[in-house]
Structure formats: C-alpha cells, structure tokens
Amino acid sequence: DIRCRIEGLASYYAAKNASPEGLARLRHIMDLQEFYFEKRDAEHLREMDDQFHDVICDMSGHAVISDTLVPLHRKTRRYRKASIADASRTAQVVKEHRAIFDAIAAGDADRAAALTTEHTIHAKKSMIERMNNHG
C-alpha cells in the first residue's frame, strides 16, 4: 500500500516537473518496451519495466521518493520478473505504462498519479497471485 502511494507521488511530480529530456528518455523506454513485447523478450521487458519506473523517480525531482522506491523495486524484482513472464499481464503492463506516459507528457499530474497507483495495485495483485501459486 505504501509503495502504491509513493509510486503515484513519483508520477505526480514527474508530470509537474517533466522536461523535454525526461520525456524523451521515457518515450524511448516505452518504444523499446513495445518492441520487446512484440518479440516476446521477457528479460528485456523486465529491464524496461525497471527503467520506466526509475526514470519516473528521477523525473519527480524528489530524492526521498527515489531513496524509498529503489530498495522496494529491488525487493520485488523476482516477483515482477515472474509477473512479466505472463503474456496477459505483460500486455496490460505495456498498456498501463503507455497511459501513464501519456498523462505525464500531458502534464496531467492527478491522472498520472491515479494511473500509476492503479498500475501498482494491479502489479501487487499479480505478484501476490504468483507467490501463492509458485512460492
């Protein structure tokens, strides 16, 4: 629950503080993520997922957000990797990331925060399901 709120705050501030350079980095990651999705390359998709969230943290301009989320991302990496291996979840992740990117690019901080919170809730549910089914 804490991660969901902090991820939402990261996107909120990323939308408020978005620079052309930050948006270009995020757009490039989105393009690569869509490319790797088409190739069904789960390993690179996970890397793009990590980078997507890391760039949003950077764009937020808040060190406390980055200092809090980076260790959480490391702790959940194994489960996020397993979740991304699921093709149906991967398709949803790509779609959710695109919507988050669009909100950040539009400067719509409230929408970016809401979409990111929703995305993180979906990821959490997927991770819990994976842990329950696969230990």
What are these regions (language model features)?
Residues I104-G107:
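Short acidic-aromatic low-complexity motifs
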Residues I121-M131:
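Short arginine-rich
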Residues I2-R5, L9, K16-A82, K95-F101, ...:
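Conserved amphipathic alpha-helical segments that form helical-bundle/coiled-coil interaction surfaces
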